[in-house]
Amino acid sequence: VISQQTIDIIKSTAPSLKKHGQQITTRMYEIMFRNHPEIKEQFDMSAQADGSQSTRLATAVYSYATQIDNLPALKSMVEKIAHRHVQTDVLPAQYPIVGESLLQAMKDVLGKAATEEVMSAWTEAYEVLSEVFINREHDIYEVNLDKMPPISK
């Protein structure tokens, strides 16, 4: 459960995310691929090159910021992303890598607006959202046992 204070802070960042979302997500991928090159093979690099992946992620992050207190409104988005994650063998252990990269990108792009309070709220909000995805993806893997990724990844 997300605290009301966190909800209020996240919602207050929505205008900045709308304005700078693409810049944040582009920066996130730069950070993530630099620090974790092994993860790159799971991504469609043509979608990286044309910016469509960054745009989709920016839209998803903005949607989460505006609907953080109404997660059922995000169900169709979560379903679509979770199924894509299953297709590309995303594992629970990769969520902290993405989270660390996203939070650093927010700091880099938002500068002084990324206060300790804002970053703490986004850390909490990301952890909650990653649990939603991890649980949903687990259920999808359970239904499709033949699609389970190798444990060693």
Question: What are these model-derived regions, one by one?
Answer:
Residues 1-153:
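Globin-like tetrapyrrole-binding proteins
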